[in-house]
Each structure stands twice: as structure tokens, then as C-alpha cells.
Amino acid sequence: MATLHFVPQHEEEQVYSISGKALKLTTSDDIKPYLEELAALKTCTKLDLSGNTIGTEASEALAKCIAENTQVRESLVEVNFADLYTSRLVDEVVDSLKFLLPVLLKCPHLEIVNLSDNAFGLRTIELLEDYIAHAVNIKHLILSNNGMGPFAGERIGKALFHLAQNKKAASKPFLETFICGRNRLENGSAVYLALGLKSHSEGLKVVKLYQNGIRPKGVATLIHYGLQYLKNLEILDLQDNTFTKHASLILAKALPTWKDSLFELNLNDCLLKTAGSDEVFKVFTEVKFPNLHVLKFEYNEMAQETIEVSFLPAMEKGNLPELEKLEINGNRLDEDSDALDLLQSKFDDLEVDDFEEVDSEDEEGEDEEDEDEDEKLEEIETERLEKELLEVQVDDLAERLAETEIK
């Protein structure tokens, strides 16, 4: 899931990769032969060190190599530093990032950065926050499975907001891809993450926030205060966060915003429940989505009636003309129904072999859970919060100018 929706194009001779070799690069001597190979390239547009483990001294040597070799520094478009700290202590990770992140800011054409599968956590958040806020050239940021938690997630959201302001000042295009899955972002990160995403509304096409333990109020907050402003959204992946009816209603209101751009919608394992599923699928009967190719809706307690009353009529109306991949397994569907037979005839790879039984106790408890006041969307003074963030931006700029004058 922590992958781009496209394959970046590079000339083979301009790629330096030691990906997946499980090298233990601790000292400068450990990494020296690889840096010599890197420096020998006439041009390097992609650097891939993923699947190795790097220490502080080796990180310093790597940063120096990038900085001192213009054919690397001036040419880099993509950097993959995923899974780079296996078996490293937290102090080593922090010290490594102190060398690597600043040198990435010196690469004027670096657009794609993958930092996934590294145990960053709270100790590294200041370094990451500063890097993200000032990486004005970046277009595609992948930060998945980094052990963030809600507090770090909130600060990532603030960093995205500051990045947008810095991009505006530098006349650089906004972020196009933000992937931040498996990070335990939970509800606590939702407000500022929403504001951060909103600030890139003119650019963002891909947002993936799967497996973050976000509850209905947090999901609703993300959509209402952030995602609904992304007019060009093509791929939205919220898999394995919890919706229920409340967040489903907010999503249903936002969906028409993306009717012309949406290519893929992943709501697998989101527990929209029967009522929430109804609300979402009703949108497809009312609004045409001419570019929607992929719809993932597994394990959501969707009822057979939703398929028959909303989804099939939407298909018959021609409201989903390009839909080619459908996932609806694990819902409350009728295995022997004509409706499923019809869908299987339309979608060759459709899997419908896991059906959830309807439990009378589930039906009785569903309405009660969906009326939980704690899960409803909270009214937030976003204008005030955005103003406060802008004031922080001005203070930060003043501090940096002062530091420059002192030097």
C-alpha cells in the first residue's frame, strides 16, 4: 500500500540502488565502497538504499557524498530511504536524520521521498517536522509504518501546512501525493492533519491514510475540514479506519466534490455499517463518476438491499461507466441472489465467498452505537487555528533570518 500510483521513470544508468541487500553500514569504511560507486555515476536521478541498516557515521559520510557531488545533488529526483534502521538504537536514528534530512533539502529537483518502515516515533518528530515544512521541491511524500502516534501525526499535519506556505512563497507546486498509513494517527491527529491536507488542496491527487485506528469523529473531521477541499483527488485510501453512520454521512456529502477526478476509493474494513453503506451508495445513484475505476468496500456490514436498491441502479444508469475492479466480500450479502450473479458476470475477478451472518443483537445495537454523541463531528474554529499557524510561520521566518545574519 505504501507505494506510488505510478512508476517513476529513470534511465537505468542513472539509478544507484543497493535495495534489499541487508547491509550493515555503521562506519564510514562500511559505506565507502558504495559511495565511491555512487560518486562515479555521471548523473544520479534515483538513490535507493532501502532494506539496509545505516548508522550515524555512515550517514554523515553519505550526506557528505551527496552534498559534494553535484551530479548527485543537482540530479536527484527520487530517494528511497525506507527500512533503513533495523536494529538501530533511537539515538542512532536521530543522529542519522540530523545528517540526511538537511542534505535532502539541498537537492533542488528531489520530488519523491520514501521514509516508510522506519521506527521514528516521537524522538525524531522535530527533525521530520522541520524537513517536511521546508521541502519545497517535494511532490510525493511516503511516510508509512513509522510509529508516529497521534501527537506526532498532529505535528506532521502542521508541517504540511507550513510546507504549503513555503511552496507558495517559492512559487513551487503543491504536494501531489501524501501516504501516511499504519501510523496510529487516531483521532488526536485529525484536526491539524485535515488543515495540512487542505492547504495543498490545489495539488493533492493521492491521499492514503490506511490502518491508523481513526474513529468516526476523527474520520469525519479529516473529511469535513480537509479532504473535501481537494478538488482534484484521484485516489483516496482510508482502509481499516472506523466510520459507522456518522462519518459515512460526511463522506457521502463530500463524494460529489470528486465526481470528475476520483479514480480509486478504498473503504475496505471501515465498518460503515448498513446505514452508512446506504448513504454512500445512494450518491452513486445520484451522481455520475466517469473516471472511477476501482471501488473497494469489503467487510463493512453492507446489506444486500444496498446492492439491489443503490449499486445496481447506479450501474444501469451509467453512473459508473469505467468501474473495472470491485471488492465487496465480507458483507451481509445473499450468496444465491440474482444481484450477485449479475455482478459476477460484470466483474471477472469479483470475490464473494465470505458472507457475514445478520445477527438480531447486531441489528438492535447498531442504531444505539450510531447515536453515540462522542462520535459526532465537532465544530472547530479552523480559521483561528490556521491564523495561529500562519503566525508561527512568520515567527519561524524571523528566527531563520536572524540566524542567517548572525552567521
Curated annotation (Swiss-Prot):
It is found in: Cytoplasm. InterPro entries: Leu-rich_rpt, LRR_dom_sf, RanGap. LRR repeats lie at residues 11-39, 40-67, 68-101, 102-133, 134-166, 167-197, 198-226, 227-256, 257-285, 286-315, 316-346. One of its GO terms (biological process) is subtelomeric heterochromatin formation. Pfam families: LRR_6. The modification Phosphoserine is found at S360. One of its GO terms (molecular function) is small GTPase binding. Keywords: Cytoplasm, GTPase activation, Leucine-rich repeat, Phosphoprotein, Repeat. Disruption phenotype: Causes conditional lethality. Strains bearing this mutation do not grow at temperatures exceeding 30 degrees Celsius. Its main location: cytoplasm. Changing A194V: In mutant RNA1-1. GO terms for cellular component: chromosome, telomeric region; cytosol; nucleus; perinuclear region of cytoplasm. Residues 353-378 are annotated as: Disordered. Gene3D superfamilies: Ribonuclease Inhibitor. Present with 52200 molecules/cell in log phase SD medium. GTPase activator for the nuclear Ras-related regulatory protein GSP1 (Ran), converting it to the putatively inactive GDP-bound state. Belongs to the RNA1 family. This is Ran GTPase-activating protein 1.
